[in-house]
Amino acid sequence: MKPSTVKNLRRAADRGEPVSEETAFDILLARPDEIPELMNAATAVRRRHFGERLQLCSILNARSGACSEDCAFCAQSAHHETHAEVFGLLDGNEIAAAYRKAAELPVSRFGVVTSGRALSDEDIEAIAATVRNTSDPRVAWCASMGCLDRSRLQLLKEAGVSRFHHNLETAESYFPEICSTHGYAQRLDTVRAVREVGLEVCCGGILGLGESLEQRVEFAALLAREEVDCIPLNFLVPIPGTRLEARPPMKPLDMIRSIAMFRMMNPKAEVKVCAGRVRMGDLQAVIFYAGATGMMVGPLLTVAGRDVSSDLRMLEDLEFPASALN
């Protein structure tokens, strides 16, 4: 990193302010021996805004496969031939049971995730009824249900959903390489509608899709402008049968650099590390020192995660206090 970048990192750490796009790009070029300096800054920013608080979340694949969209990475797209399960919306009792099971873990959020561009009114009303009738003070309801309009989002909010997840996936300049069945503007409109109805915004994407480093910074800068509440970072897991099946996965240190860059550009947003984390191997524990405030645990959508007991043991080894999980 340039001397000016180190200076800018230290200033950002002291003030808790976002770094410039120029500094962010330099973060992605940090040499291995510069990673400790980068982690010092990212950890300082995390602690300034979040203390030692960490947040674990889990999700339920509540409707799978047969998606009309052609996202290049996705095993659930009907445009791809994969081994992903295909099933309709789960019964409300199944969703409620999964929520109650999650409440027995130290997770603070439980997300209901459905495939497809958007759920029907009937399905949304069914999920809203489940949320309305199932609650636990330990776990907040989240939803990820595609491109919904304000009226549908409002219905979910009134039922008890507190946060809506809708990824932009990548930089706007790279999105046409990833999806052709809908545009970036539609996704961005949904993100803004979520904010307008008063739900918290969970919005991030997948890194390692083939985007340039400049586009990775472009993406982080957009999330900063949108002032999202939480940024879930996924790392591409190439799935056989998808258009990106042959793309090599990111290297662990590149993942660390990217987490730190998103943290330094979005100092007040939660940064959660989700799918692809297992590919970091022995470096998984480093994510918190790169600025992450949480991670997704348990089953994912179409790729394997790590067993929850291993993740909880990792947090114990890091000596995060039990009170840190909220």
UniProtKB/Swiss-Prot annotation:
Name of a matching Pfam family: Radical_SAM
EC number(s) on file: 2.8.1.6
Domain Radical SAM core: 49-277
Record-level GO BP terms: biotin biosynthetic process
Residues the entry annotates as binding [4Fe-4S] cluster: 67, 71, 74
Cofactor list: [4Fe-4S] cluster; [2Fe-2S] cluster
Signal peptide range: none
Reactions it catalyzes: (4R,5S)-dethiobiotin + (sulfur carrier)-SH + 2 reduced [2Fe-2S]-[ferredoxin] + 2 S-adenosyl-L-methionine = (sulfur carrier)-H + biotin + 2 5'-deoxyadenosine + 2 L-methionine + 2 oxidized [2Fe-2S]-[ferredoxin]
Alphabetical list of HAMAP family matching this protein: BioB
Assembly behavior: Homodimer.
Protein name per Swiss-Prot or TrEMBL: Biotin synthase
Source organism phylogeny: Bacteria, Pseudomonadati, Thermodesulfobacteriota, Syntrophobacteria, Syntrophobacterales
Gene: bioB
